[in-house]
Amino acid sequence: MFTIDIILQMSPIPVSVQRKDEESAQSLYQSITQAMQEPNPKLIELTCDKQPDKKVAIFSNQISAVIVSEKTGAAAAGRAPGFLAIGEI
């Protein structure tokens, strides 16, 4: 399962959706980053493979960052993906 975390401006909590395979996760990542680069804001509607009833709509000009990560048993240890603790260096 792959998680796409979307960091919004002025919001400390990311919006997350899941994709079952890497190809669809990368495709969603590319479409979000392309929408972020457009000069006019675009409404992005997202659904989640893990929770099919989950739906979210976000304006592209409110997105600060997008993170794609694979959720495995080791990655579910309570830390945000992609960040290294100081003690682990």
UniProtKB/Swiss-Prot annotation:
InterPro entries: UPF0367. Belongs to the UPF0367 family. This is UPF0367 protein PCC7424_2975. It comes from Gloeothece citriformis (strain PCC 7424).
